[in-house]
């Protein structure tokens, strides 16, 4: 992978990630394909929304279908018929989400399979081996996602163990002679000094990119913004910056304003299945009865397949009848909305008009522009 930085506007960055399988324009949003599919979508449909890269889930793909089946197909690209770049998370966040049914030790994590209750052990080395089998273009280190709330001492111990796991991840990645890219993950909770220590340790090890983890886990939005404003300028400028698991459209805007290059989140797809649709004027809840006889499209400013062909009344009808097509059309729209937002942000950075773009974004939704802390 090669990262090119073209231009900046304030702290926002316009660039691209160049892989053998294709180029990803940044800032970029990555749709989430947990089980090797963006729910309800064919790869061609996802690509048509403007997506250059997908995120796959190491933990779930390890449990089902498993490494052996993946290797028989070649890798995840061949298995799911997506021949463009794929980033896979390490499984650390999914293990964190298991709560009481997992035990974290220095060696790794012991837990019971949420599928059949089988005892399973996952450590940095195994995570690297799974992602090698997946053929991930971007591999994420295995880390512990620091919970919120956490005391500074708890956050420090978690962050320092993640640093030790980062070293083990790097060593195993190198031992496997994996030709792809490996990203480190900055932890430390809401504590700036711990974030500093984490980043320094990761830079000393050396990675192809740096992710900010452990945000959007329940902390106040102001803390997320504060940590991003503090840590992003310290990340080496020639490396991509990835904000994991974020988020709402306004979170993407605020992340870009603070120098983030990459995002992922299940929100556009999950919300689509629940009838929450993002538009240029805010969220539409298609299940509301007022859409029953509305012949207008979801968003007159959207060029997606759904908006060009179907009315709000039709989408309301599909939702009320629990038709699968409704969820699919909603998903196409939400994914395209996110990609159009990223296209707009990239264009604004290129032309030095990001402030105006951000102001228009919030004005159209009847909201004030959040201030940058620094």
Curated annotation (Swiss-Prot):
- Gene Ontology CC entries for this record: cytosol
As recorded in UniProt, coiled-coil segments are none
> Which N-terminal stretch is annotated as signal sequence?
none
Which Pfam families does the entry link to?
TGT
Q: Name one GO biological process term.
A: queuosine biosynthetic process
Oligomer and partners: Homodimer. Within each dimer, one monomer is responsible for RNA recognition and catalysis, while the other monomer binds to the replacement base PreQ1.
* HAMAP family membership: Q_tRNA_Tgt
Indicate what this protein is called per its UniProt record: Queuine tRNA-ribosyltransferase
Species the sequence originates in: Shewanella baltica (strain OS185)
Give the organism's phylogenetic lineage: Bacteria, Pseudomonadati, Pseudomonadota, Gammaproteobacteria, Alteromonadales
């Amino acid at each position: 992978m090669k990262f090119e930085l073209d231009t900046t506007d304030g702290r926002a960055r316009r660039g691209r990630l160049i892989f053998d399988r294709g180029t990803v324009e940044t800032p970029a949003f990555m749709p989430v394909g947990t089980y090797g599919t963006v729910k309800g979508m064919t790869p061609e449909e996802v690509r048509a929304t403007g997506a250059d890269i997908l995120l796959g889930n190491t933990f779930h793909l390890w449990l089902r279908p498993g490494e052996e089946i993946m290797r028989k197909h070649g890798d995840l690209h061949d298995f799911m018929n997506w021949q463009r770049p794929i980033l896979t998370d390490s499984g650390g966040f999914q293990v964190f989400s298991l709560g009481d049914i997992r035990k974290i030790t220095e060696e790794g994590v012991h837990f019971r399979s949420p599928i059949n209750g089988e005892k399973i052990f996952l450590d940095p080395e195994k995570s690297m081996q799974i992602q090698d089998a997946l053929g991930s273009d971007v591999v994420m280190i295995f880390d512990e996602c620091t919970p919120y709330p956490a005391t500074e001492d708890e956050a420090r111990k978690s962050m320092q163990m993640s640093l030790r796991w980062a070293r083990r991840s790097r060593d195993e990645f190198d031992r496997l002679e994996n030709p792809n890219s490996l990203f480190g993950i900055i932890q430390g909770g809401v504590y700036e000094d711990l974030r500093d220590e984490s980043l320094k340790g990761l830079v000393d090890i050396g990675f192809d990119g740096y992710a900010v983890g452990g945000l959007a886990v329940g902390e106040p939005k102001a803390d997320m913004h504060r940590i991003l404003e503090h840590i992003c300028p310290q990340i080496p400028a020639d490396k991509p910056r990835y904000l994991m698991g974020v988020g709402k459209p306004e979170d993407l805007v605020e992340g870009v304003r603070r120098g983030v290059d990459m995002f992922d989140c299940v929100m556009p797809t999950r919300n689509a299945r629940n009838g929450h649709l993002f538009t240029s004027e805010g969220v539409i809840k298609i299940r509301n009865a007022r859409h029953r006889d509305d012949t207008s499209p979801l968003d007159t400013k959207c060029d997606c397949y759904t908006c060009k062909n179907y009315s709000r009344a039709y989408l309301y009808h599909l939702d009320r009848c629990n038709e699968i097509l409704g969820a699919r059309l909603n998903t196409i729209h939400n994914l395209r909305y996110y990609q159009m937002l990223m296209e707009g942000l990239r264009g604004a950075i290129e032309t030095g008009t990001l402030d105006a773009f951000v102001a228009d974004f919030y004005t159209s939704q009847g909201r004030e522009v959040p201030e940058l802390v620094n």
